[in-house]
Amino acid sequence: MGTVKRLLAAAGFVACGQMGLMAQASARITLGLSDWPGWVAWYVAQHNGYLKKYGAHVRLVWFPSYMTSVEALSAGRIDANCQALIDTIAPIVRKVPIKVILVTDNSAGNDALMVNNTIHSFAGLKGKSIAVEMNSIEEYLDVTALHEHHMGVSDVHFVNMSTGNSAAALITGRVAAAGVWNPWIQRIEARRAGHPLFTSAQAPGLIPDLVVARAAVVAAHKKDFVGLAKAWFATVRFIKAHPRQAARIMAPHVDLTPAVYAESLSGTRLFGAHMNRVAMNPGGSPASLYNSTIQTTRFLRQVKMVNATPSPRAFIDAGIVNQAAR
């Protein structure tokens, strides 16, 4: 799931701002989400009544543009948001008062470096152009892939484009490769325009996706957030037990068929209670945010997005997950 900077920003901001105001009128907490499979899963929680069952007074607020949701949380226009770790660290370094309270998933194949059908190795990628949104998760994955194959950024030519435009550039042959996430991976494959050379399945723990909330709201509505976590754990159990039924609930929200959307789910490792405790607490697992924060911040410092490494203890609130998992 890469950063979608300002796709439909003006329209998306106005629409989502209006939805946010309506949500605040009828719920204690507004939770922003966008089209990543691990976040569309919240509609399963809503559909199945888990939010109500576990006492989470939460209204889901849909954002057509992912980065608009990140900006809305930082500005305090929503109470909580579904966003990636890589897009959470910079606001934390800027002292935005937010806390990570839940891990929804890790990308496990839903982010990929896609290449045209003439390229079958990293050696074949040398000297070629890669369309990718710079300073995003997709660039992070691409740079990681290059390094793992003994190549560097100087061995390729990065072309800065939004993720949708990156996919279009590969499909039309304007570039040899593109850093994208689903559903763009599926759209490239459906047009037989390319295949994955490297995916997030080959980099466990590299791309954690989170629920991040305003610190003051967490303090004021802890019971609601505990209920939210319980609802999430129930959602994960349901999706794992009934993937086809879950896909039927989720697919209409992203304008895909259930069959196609089921493939997206397979590339997302949803985190239930056990994996949340692993991720939200210190430990040796690649899934621990204490480890991925260091790795992710190293990349962000290299591209000059941040100038400091935040302490995970300062922004990870494991109390919500630990209480919900009892």
Residue ranges and their predicted role:
Residues 1-9:
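Bacterial N-terminal signal peptides that target proteins for export
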Residues 9-18:
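Bacterial N-terminal signal peptides
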Residues 24-166, 172, 176-182, 197-199, ...:
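Short, glycine-/small- and polar/acidic-enriched structural segments
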Residues 86-87, 158-159, 165-259:
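Pocket-lining segment of extracytoplasmic ligand-binding domains
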Residues 127, 190, 317:
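Phosphate-coordinating loops and pocket residues in cytosolic domains that bind phosphorylated ligands
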Residues 220-305:
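Secondary-structure end/capping motifs
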